[in-house]
């Protein structure tokens, strides 16, 4: 059994759990690039004490490299919890991440998200680095 056996993928326009990656298709070498990853962009995902996105991880797989590099892990820890009960707390974190990277090789951005009920979800986007 492998962890990859449990990672789901779908079209983000049909499935609310899939992380949506927003990044340019082409960038210049060593240029600062903004990457935004959102869960529930097209179809809103619940954000309740009982059902929420716990975290998003972003990776980069350079072309021709046997390794994947972790860009960051982003946790969402507030989902309406309160000592008075569920879903009446003062704060809810939304499953959206913005990060900035500099790339010197073309490759693939990979986003992985975790729903506390429906498990792991993945998406990817190719990005080309030009001189």
From Swiss-Prot:
PANTHER family in UniProt: SUPEROXIDE REDUCTASE-RELATED
Entry cofactors: Fe cation
Presence of the UniProt keyword Transport in the record: yes
Single GO molecular function: iron ion binding
Species name: Thermotoga maritima (strain ATCC 43589 / DSM 3109 / JCM 10099 / NBRC 100826 / MSB8)
Protein name stated in the entry: Putative superoxide reductase
Span of the signal peptide: none
Enzyme class: oxidoreductase
Classification via Pfam families: Desulfoferrodox (PF01880)
EC number of this enzyme: 1.15.1.2
NCBIfam families: neela_ferrous
Keyword list, A-Z: Electron transport, Iron, Metal-binding, Oxidoreductase, Transport
Binding-site positions, Fe cation: 15, 17, 45, 51, 115, 118
Catalysed reaction equations from the record: reduced [rubredoxin] + superoxide + 2 H(+) = oxidized [rubredoxin] + H2O2
Function in brief: Uses electrons from reduced NADP, by way of rubredoxin and an oxidoreductase, to catalyze the reduction of superoxide to hydrogen peroxide.
SUPFAM superfamilies assigned to the protein according to its UniProt record, in alphabetical order: Superoxide reductase-like
Entries under InterPro entries matching the protein: Desulfoferrodoxin_Fe-bd_dom, Desulfoferrodoxin_Fe-bd_dom_sf, Desulfoferrodoxin_SOR
